[in-house]
């Protein structure tokens, strides 16, 4: 430090010497050298960092080019544009300092380029799996649309690193899923159309073999149809078999018989009038369709040139066939449509409904098809309603008329000589019917248990009495009915045996009438084909057989043959009108019968009424 001589000596005791003190330059020089060294070191570090960045960029370029070249050789050359994009992404990530080291900075580009495919360059293995934010366990959540939850901490949000996933799980769970998600992180569907195409080599490797089944017509009558000699030559293309048929079997101008001898042909050897018609017919057996539609994007093919000509009019809009009726300007693309339309102007209705009982007819087949839907909506099927035209046989699958029921074609009418009250007016409606008159065909089940006739249409008193006697023979083998039913049945037997007994009181007669109305007479065991566990009581006296013959037969149907078996739910059961006698059936007797003997019948029988 230099002292000034003019300073007051009281304050500075060295001023009397007149000396000027200079600062120490050694310390300042050392500080300057240290600063220079630090600057040099910083400069060197910056240069090293720049060199490392340049080297990293070169490595990124080389790795991207190598990966793109590898996938170009494996058939995915249309993804070359990803190389430049991934290089820029890797450079951007290095600039932001996302990677922790120079080796980690190269992982961004590597994880983007189809890591799910097996074709990988050997020098790329070191860079896989080093992405700082990679997490294999989040891979499937990313693919399921949960990437938003991880986008905040992840700059690029690509988790398709397949080799790192292999570190966690050596066995690949879904290799195709990894591949598709790696190709397009936003969604694999954009590239699905490229994956579905089969290679041309596999399509060409499948050989189409066709066999000629033409029968040798030299001696067709001497050999049985199953033993005729066939050609059986095998061809590998449509052109080969068509050429073979044309040359070997159809023949040239010298052949005058134009008949098809293909195995199973429906023409049965009937010849054609011209050779070209036979050639067109053979295409039915070979499946050849040489006439393709030239319209772009149509792709339809046809076996006949006429059909192609008609089809072309759908593209051009041409309608050369004008309606021949005066005053009608309708035009059509083909003559068949014009013919269908021509019936509109005439009274002809050639398209008839073939359902039995339906007399509808229409001028156009489309109207008939709409009408047939009415019949098709009916779920019930009856064997008595079938087709009655064109020689077609009726089948059990034919449908009945929808909406209203058809009139009954056959009724189970009683004979004229049956017992009293069998045939009478039904409920005062004026319609003559028997107790078994239904709106359906007779069921074969009636003939099983009647034993007198196959259709069950004659139920006389003698036949009912024979049934009763037959039931009496089995009465000793049965157990007695419950006591309550037995007492009621005994009362009914007494009143039935002596209906005009003057000793009977009016109250007892009223009770007997009600009992006879609601309880059937005791019956014998059912036939062997029924499995109802009934128990019947003792039989009535033989004198009551003739009086209750018709009622016995009626109740026999109700007991052993539930109405659900032979009476459709929509059919009404016609009963006889009530008479003055106590033994006559009440029109409501089947309701009471179901009430008292519901345990003897099928659960679904009561719903038939």
From Swiss-Prot:
Single annotated GO MF: zinc ion binding
Gene3D superfamilies: Classic Zinc Finger
Any one GO CC term of the record: nucleus
Region (Disordered): 20-41, 373-550, 583-609
Primary site of residence: nucleus
Record-linked SMART domains: ZnF_C2H2 (SM00355)
Listed Basic residues bias regions: 528-537, 591-601
Zn finger spans (C2H2-type): 210-249, 258-285, 291-315, 321-345, 351-375
Record's subcellular location: Nucleus
InterPro entries, per database record: GLI-like, Znf-C2H2_ZIC1-5/GLI1-3-like, Znf_C2H2_sf, Znf_C2H2_type, Znf_ZIC
Low complexity composition bias: residue spans: 414-434, 449-498, 538-550
Protein name: Pair-rule protein odd-paired
Lineage, opening ranks: Eukaryota, Metazoa, Ecdysozoa, Arthropoda, Hexapoda
């Amino acid at each position: 430090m230099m002292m000034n001589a003019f300073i007051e000596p009281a304050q500075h005791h060295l001023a009397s010497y007149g000396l000027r003190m200079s600062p120490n330059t050694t310390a300042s020089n050392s500080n300057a050298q240290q600063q220079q060294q630090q600057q040099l070191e910083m400069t060197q570090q910056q240069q090293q960092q720049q060199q490392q960045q340049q080297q990293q960029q070169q490595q990124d370029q080389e790795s991207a080019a190598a990966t793109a070249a590898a996938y170009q050789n494996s058939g995915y050359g249309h993804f070359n544009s990803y190389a430049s994009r991934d290089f820029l992404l890797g450079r951007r990530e290095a600039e932001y300092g996302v990677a922790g080291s120079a080796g980690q900075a190269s992982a961004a580009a590597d994880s983007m380029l189809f890591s799910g495919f097996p074709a990988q360059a050997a020098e790329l293995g070191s860079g896989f799996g080093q992405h700082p934010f990679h997490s294999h366990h989040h891979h499937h959540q990313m693919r399921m649309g949960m990437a938003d939850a991880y986008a905040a901490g992840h700059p690029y949000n690509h988790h398709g690193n397949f080799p790192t996933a292999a570190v966690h799980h050596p066995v690949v769970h879904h290799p195709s899923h990894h591949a598709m998600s790696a190709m397009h992180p936003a969604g694999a569907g954009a590239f699905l159309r490229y994956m579905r195409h089969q290679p041309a080599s596999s399509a060409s490797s499948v050989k189409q073999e066709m066999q000629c089944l033409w029968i040798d017509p030299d001696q067709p009558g001497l050999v049985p149809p199953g033993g005729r000699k066939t050609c059986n030559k095998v061809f590998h293309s449509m052109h080969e078999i068509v050429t073979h048929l044309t040359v070997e079997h159809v023949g040239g101008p010298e052949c005058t018989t134009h008949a098809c001898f293909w195995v199973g042909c429906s023409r049965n050897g009937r010849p054609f009038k011209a050779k070209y018609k036979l050639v067109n017919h053979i295409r039915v057996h070979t499946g050849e369709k040489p006439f393709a539609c030239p319209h772009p994007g149509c792709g339809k093919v046809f076996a006949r040139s006429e059909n192609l000509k008609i089809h072309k009019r759908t593209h051009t809009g041409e309608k050369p066939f004008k309606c021949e009726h005066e005053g009608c300007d309708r035009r059509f693309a083909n003559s068949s449509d014009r013919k269908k339309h021509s019936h509109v102007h005439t009274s002809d209705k050639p398209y008839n409904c073939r359902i039995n009982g339906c007399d509808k007819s229409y001028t156009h087949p489309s109207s008939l098809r709409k009408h047939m839907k009415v019949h098709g909506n009916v779920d019930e099927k009856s064997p008595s309603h079938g087709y009655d035209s064109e020689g077609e046989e009726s089948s059990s699958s034919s449908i009945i008329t929808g909406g209203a029921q058809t009139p009954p074609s056959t009724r189970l009418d009683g004979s004229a000589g049956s017992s009293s009250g069998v045939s009478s007016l039904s409920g005062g409606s004026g319609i003559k019917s028997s107790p078994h008159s239904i709106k359906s065909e007779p069921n074969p089940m009636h003939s099983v248990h009647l034993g007198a006739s196959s259709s069950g249409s004659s139920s006389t008193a003698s036949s009912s009495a024979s049934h009763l006697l037959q039931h009496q023979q089995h009465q000793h083998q049965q157990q007695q009915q419950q006591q309550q039913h037995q007492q009621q049945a005994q009362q009914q037997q007494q009143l039935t045996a002596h209906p005009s007994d003057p000793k009977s009181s009016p109250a007892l007669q009223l009770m007997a009438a009600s009992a006879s109305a609601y309880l059937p007479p005791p019956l014998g065991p059912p036939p062997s084909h029924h499995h109802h566990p009934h128990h019947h009581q003792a039989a009535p006296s033989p004198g009551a057989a003739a009086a209750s013959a018709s009622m016995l037969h009626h109740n026999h149907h109700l007991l052993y043959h539930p109405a659900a078996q032979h009476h459709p739910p929509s059919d009404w059961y016609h009963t006889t009108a009530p008479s003055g006698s106590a033994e006559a059936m009440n029109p409501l007797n089947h309701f009471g019968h179901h009430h008292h003997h519901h345990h003897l019948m099928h659960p679904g029988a009561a719903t038939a009424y």
